Every structure is written in C-alpha cells, then in structure tokens.
C-alpha cells in the first residue's frame, strides 16, 4: 500500500530486442535534493524515536519540500511488508512483532513538530488478525490527546477484506480516510498480486456508508501500461462510491527488477485527468508527475468536507 516514490534512476520497459531502454528523465520529473535545517531536524527526530516514514522507505521525491515544512507521513507497524507488490520500494519479508508502544512515540513526534496535520500509513501486516488496525486507532487517539487541534489522515491497507478492522479505524474518527486504488483493473493482479480491485472499491464504499461526512480519498499511478481511457474509467468508479479527493502521479520503478515504467505521462495529460475528475464531482484533485498521496495533504481536508 505504500506510495512509490523513488529518487534513483527509474526502471523502464524493455523494447522487443531485449536491450534495456533507459531514457533520461523529463525535466518535469526532477525534484530538488533534500536538505536544510528543518529537514535535518525531522530526520534526527525520526531516528531518536525509532520511527519510520513512508517519505524515506518509499524514496519520495518530495521529501525535502515536505520535511522543510516540518511535515511527514508516519509509517506504522514497522518497515517490513508481508506483501510483494511489484511497484513498491518498501522492504518485504517476515516483519518483527508489532510494537505496541509505537503510537505513543508517533504522538510525541507530532507534538514535537507542532503539526496541524498528520498523515499515518503502514505496511501490510497480514500476519496479525486485525492487520494492525488497533495501532492506527490508538495512534489517532494519542495524537488527539497531545495535539487536540491536529487533523489526522490515515492511508490504510485493505486489511485483506477484514471489515471489522476497518471499523476499528473508523471508530477512532480520522479526518480523512485514504485507500489507494493504485492502478487500473486490467493490471491489478499483476501489479498487486495479493490485492483485489473490487475489494478496494468496497472498502471505500463501506467507509462512506459508515461515516457519511468523512472525507474519503484515493490515488493511482500512471505510466505503468494503462491507457488514458482506463484512467478515466477508474476515476468514474471511484466517484461511484463518493470518494472526495483524488491523487494521480507518475509511476516510477525503484529499479529495473520492479514493474517497468511504460511511459512518462505529460503534464498536459495530468491536467486533463484533473479536469475530468473535477467535472465528475471530486472536490479536490492533485494530478501531476510528482504527486503522491500525502503531498499537500493538509489542503485536502478543508476543500473536501461536505
């Protein structure tokens, strides 16, 4: 479920001859190298608290910009995922036992950074019955205790269709519930072998039914082999379950062993996706080459609330 955001050279599709085609990145895909006082302060705090961020684990190109604004997306439940999605840079394998003290450390970090908006995400934890949902809930509760004015977005996995786990997260009343659809149905099982497109749609529909005023959000990556028409179809499908906020960004492979980049989608096409989504009723759309789920997340909740 992690956002794929590599900083290194991307893997790209191989031509029929078998030679690896590695074109230079377009200018619009270049991000500023991370640095600055605030960046190093956030980095130090994460190390001191033994915390993980999706910013680092998924190699986000926006890490410098976000951390210099003293914002970060906290990665709960460790840094090892039980799934092997073909696009994701986060480590895979057998994770350590869940750290029940992690919510306290995250809440302390949110307070230290004086955040007004915190984003919580996680690896998949198919090795535990609730998928780690209780850690999401406890983290939300502790953030609210320590920083009452801080709004919280959760970017959750599918919990393998465990709707009781979803209910646990919803009961903690996050301000935004995000679950990324990631790609189009035709590519889904190859891109995300242990996930199901319709299950993700059902999760978003259940969240809306359980909490009608909740801001719901989803995102996808493009340039992975889909057609633009398929992107429009996914946009329509997400609106059919009343998703409020949509993010669309360029797929970039961590290295050549991952799912290949098939093409670089142009800024003009991203603008067309945004216009189409807004016309279909999304209240906030981020669509651009370097857009990732958590980018400008603090702007989404106000724009999207019913």
Curated annotation (Swiss-Prot):
- Obligatory cofactor(s): [4Fe-4S] cluster
As recorded in UniProt, its EC number(s) are 2.8.1.8
A GO cellular component entry from the record? cytoplasm
Give the binding site residues for [4Fe-4S] cluster 1: 55, 60, 66, 294
Q: Name one Pfam family in it.
A: Radical_SAM
Q: Which NCBIfam families match?
A: lipA (TIGR00510), PRK05481.1 (NF004019), PRK12928.1 (NF009544)
Q: Which PANTHER family match?
A: LIPOYL SYNTHASE, LIPOYL SYNTHASE, MITOCHONDRIAL
Protein name in the entry: Lipoyl synthase
Q: Which organism is it from?
A: Chloroflexus aurantiacus (strain ATCC 29366 / DSM 635 / J-10-fl)
Q: Provide the organism lineage as a comma list.
A: Bacteria, Bacillati, Chloroflexota, Chloroflexia, Chloroflexales
